[in-house]
Amino acid sequence: MGSLQKILPEAVSEAVEEAFLGKLQAKIFAGANNLVLAIRAVQAAYGDAGVETIRRAFAESWAETGKEMAKESADNPLRSLCSTLEQTCMGSHEWIKLEDSATRQAYRFTRCMWAEAFRELNAEDIGFWVLCQGDASLASSFNPLIGFSRTKTLMMGDDCCDHVCYLKTQ
């Protein structure tokens, strides 16, 4: 999965999709580069305390995002969360859905343009805490009954991200 075809109002040719994805990748790289430059500048001026402040701000932002997403949630909160995340990842990520049940959704992400950009910038650490660490707080703030687990990330050099979202047992 990951093709733009599912979210476009009408089908486009493979060449058009590739051109669009190339532009998307360039924009992701530019955004990641600006973020890395800003964070490194804060680190140089304010040390680790400055970076920790930024890290906390991103964690809070992911939690707020989860709460906002929940406002538009359907009946099944787990399926609603995962459907929204899939829509968000279209184009910039490639994945296989390994499990699709009412209580558990499992994925194997094999491509992430964000991980590619942060790796190229030698800033996987920043990419990890800006993006990857937000996954769990986004899920739990969307609905406290939703859990999230992952043992691998493309951002940190693994061959995939193994995301699992599940309903916690009560």
Where are these regions (language model features)?
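A contiguous catalytic/ligand-binding core that recognizes phosphate-bearing ligands
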Residues: 140
